[in-house]
């Protein structure tokens, strides 16, 4: 079952088709970013027990999500920058030849989404319409990822407005929880392919691919080529009960 795609861009459609053939989900759902779709996904997550609805009087709109005890942090020793030249990965990163890494990981993804739904998440890092914004598409088998990407990015069909119907300039993010096996957990960046692969984790820092993976690692490579610098930071807005907002 495949819901209607949100773009005519052949590069996006071809890649999603390839990832679907590899991971073999039962269903493919394109995320349009609408409130109706997000509310439905929240309800589904609550009904399956993946998330717990907290006291809505004290914490309105808040859901509680837990990962497995072996999956509660980023894994630096399993995080790789895979570019052709080892020196380009930088002195503080792990490196492996891109072809060797893909040969190792591809069998892990084969059929990893059987019995599950693949969510196709278009998103923009930066305001829609901004010449500085960068577009990504993440495919995942996690509702948690969808709901958090909705918070952390400009998620939904409007992201394709920045990309257009012909451009190939988007970051391809492939994520599957698979078996959440810590011995087969990898978070891999392929800068020269504009791609990120994450497998066997459900923890935010490893699976929200617009975060560290794109905004810091892939963006550093993009910035090097395009003459800008990637700055990884947080702007926090704190809202008082009277409605005043202070930004930190």
Language-model regions, residue ranges each:
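Conserved internal helical-beta-strand scaffold that buttresses enzyme catalytic cores
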Residues: 2-247
């Amino acid at each position: 079952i495949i819901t209607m795609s949100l773009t005519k861009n052949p590069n996006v459609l071809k890649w999603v088709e390839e990832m679907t053939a590899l991971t073999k989900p039962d269903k493919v759902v394109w995320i349009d970013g609408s409130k109706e779709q997000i509310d439905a996904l929240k309800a589904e997550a609550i009904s399956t027990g993946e998330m717990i609805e907290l006291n809505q009087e004290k914490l309105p709109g808040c859901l509680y999500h837990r990962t497995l005890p072996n999956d509660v942090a980023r894994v630096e020793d399993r995080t790789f920058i895979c570019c052709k030249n080892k020196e380009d990965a930088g002195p503080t990163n792990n490196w492996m030849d891109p072809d060797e890494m893909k040969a190792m990981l591809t069998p892990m993804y084969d059929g990893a989404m059987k019995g599950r739904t693949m969510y196709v998440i278009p998103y923009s890092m930066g305001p829609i319409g901004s010449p500085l914004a960068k577009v990504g598409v993440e495919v995942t088998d996690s509702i948690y990822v969808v709901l958090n990407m909705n918070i952390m990015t400009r998620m939904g069909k409007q992201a394709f407005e920045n990309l257009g119907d012909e451009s190939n300039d988007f970051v391809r993010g492939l994520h599957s929880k698979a078996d959440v096996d810590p011995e087969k957990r990898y978070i891999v960046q392929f800068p020269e392919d504009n791609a990120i692969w994450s497998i066997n984790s459900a923890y935010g820092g490893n699976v929200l691919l617009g975060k560290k993976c794109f905004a810091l690692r892939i963006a550093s490579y993009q910035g090097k080529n395009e003459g800008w610098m990637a700055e990884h930071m947080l702007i926090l807005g704190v809202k008082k009960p009277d409605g005043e907002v202070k930004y930190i």
